[in-house]
């Protein structure tokens, strides 16, 4: 992994493809990161953004390798705003999409049913979406 990072920093490669790892084995040998994404973030001193893509679809995740019990702690206005901005920057710079159109998913079933089964959509997700809309971004959600 470190050799791949070195080649990327030297601009000798355009990207890195990572393969599945057995986290237990790595942790037992001193690799104290839950996955490649977090390690790459630490090495680059940047917030990592995991993007999965194919010819028709590009998906970014707000969280990386964390237990489901910790997800709601990571769904904050600051994290969501930073993630969306990084994603917009990547879509524009890395993929040449001039005005990216982004859909933001809901956290709760049925987008929280207007607060009846979760308030994250009302208190966190929608205000951040509205903030990007005010900046002229094409963004939808929570979906």
Identify what each model region corresponds to.
Residues 1-143:
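Anion-binding alpha/beta catalytic cores of soluble intermediary-metabolism enzymes, centered on
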């Amino acid at each position: 992994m470190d050799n791949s990072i070195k080649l990327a920093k030297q601009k000798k490669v355009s990207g890195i493809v990572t393969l599945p790892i057995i986290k237990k084995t790595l942790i037992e040998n001193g690799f104290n990161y839950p996955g490649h994404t977090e390690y790459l973030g630490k090495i680059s001193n940047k917030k990592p953004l995991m993007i999965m893509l194919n010819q028709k679809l590009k998906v970014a995740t707000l969280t990386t390798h964390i237990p489901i019990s910790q997800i709601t702690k990571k769904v904050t206005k600051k994290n969501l705003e930073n993630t969306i901005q990084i994603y917009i920057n990547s879509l524009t710079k890395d993929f040449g999409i001039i005005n990216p159109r982004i859909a933001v998913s809901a956290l709760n079933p049925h987008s929280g049913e207007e607060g009846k089964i979760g308030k994250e959509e009302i208190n966190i997700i929608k205000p951040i979406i509205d903030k990007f809309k005010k900046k002229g971004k094409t963004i939808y959600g929570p979906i």
